[in-house]
């Protein structure tokens, strides 16, 4: 009798993706984040669906419907905070996943990498629109500031902003459409993640050495299924601690005040995971320049395959590139800190230096360091 998992049309897909998939024998815990992102996405879709059952996307009732979820719905507070902190965990896993790809040269799988960049944009758009939904002060003013950036686009900018707003300011129409987009985008993200995996399985996984692992493969199950389960348990532990002990740790107190178009909060800032991009946006005095820098701060990732000048794929055996990588990581942490600070001395200049360093490192210093390493090895 033939094995059903190897013959059944549906089971065969699952089998070839998660059971009999040949995987490199030496992939480290940095390869766990893909599965963790999948878990985060499922968690967000499930909690989001339950929240949508009780939420109303109307400016008059949105804030009170969220209060109602937290106070009156059975375990509503838990669902709401799982969803809010699940987004933070999602971005932590995303940053780790992208960082792993940058360090070990995974961007050389160009199709997989470019779909990953597209996924990053989609997740950022979804998170931004989700932050608007509770209709607190920071929701309203965040939506106003960020959508207003599109007015920097020459000629069509103003019309485009009013088209997105559905009027002359962020109002009922904006909230309703943001809710619609926030609901549909995660399913598009799930489909894109499927395509991401499809392209990954065309080439097989990369590994820490950056060398071909064709000579030494092991089956995904049980080796990496058990490893992914350990990662999942750690993720669940962290998110449980966050949700049950300090659910508002990563939030903004301003968002507990209902949206008021007549009162601007002293410091408008997005959620922590956007602060690095927000700092880059603010560090350029020109509006259009700032918007371009904001988009390029993520889009620059798509250029990495073109900027790879080293004859080795991974940074594992390249100490100079390793130092620059961790300098880039420290720079991003600096930008995140600056993004949450008021626009005053010395934060302005720190933000500008960190922003210039960010692009300078990726576009110029790292490719040059790779060429130097090639020469040092007399390649």
Curated annotation (Swiss-Prot):
One of its GO terms (biological process) is mitochondrial electron transport, ubiquinol to cytochrome c. Heme b b562 binds at residues 83, 182. The chain crosses the membrane at residues 33-53, 77-98, 113-133, 178-198, 226-246, 288-308, 320-340, 347-367. It is a multi-pass membrane protein. It is found in: Mitochondrion inner membrane. The keyword Transmembrane applies. Heme b b566 binds at residues 97, 196. Signal peptide: none annotated. A ubiquinone binds at residue 201. Its cofactor is heme b. InterPro entries: Cyt_b/b6_C, Cyt_b/b6_C_sf, Cyt_b/b6_N, Cytb/b6-like_sf, Cytochrome_b, Cytochrome_b_C_euk/bac, Cytochrome_b_N_euk/bac, Di-haem_cyt_TM. Keywords: Electron transport, Heme, Iron, Membrane, Metal-binding, Mitochondrion, Mitochondrion inner membrane, Respiratory chain, Transmembrane, Transmembrane helix, Transport, Ubiquinone. Binds 2 heme b groups non-covalently. It holds the Pfam family Cytochrom_B_C. It comes from the Eukaryota. One of its GO terms (molecular function) is metal ion binding. Component of the ubiquinol-cytochrome c reductase complex (complex III or cytochrome b-c1 complex) that is part of the mitochondrial respiratory chain. The b-c1 complex mediates electron transfer from ubiquinol to cytochrome c. Contributes to the generation of a proton gradient across the mitochondrial membrane that is then used for ATP synthesis. Belongs to the cytochrome b family. The cytochrome bc1 complex contains 11 subunits: 3 respiratory subunits (MT-CYB, CYC1 and UQCRFS1), 2 core proteins (UQCRC1 and UQCRC2) and 6 low-molecular weight proteins (UQCRH/QCR6, UQCRB/QCR7, UQCRQ/QCR8, UQCR10/QCR9, UQCR11/QCR10 and a cleavage product of UQCRFS1). This cytochrome bc1 complex then forms a dimer. This is Cytochrome b. It comes from Galemys pyrenaicus. The lineage of its organism: Eukaryota, Metazoa, Chordata, Craniata, Vertebrata.
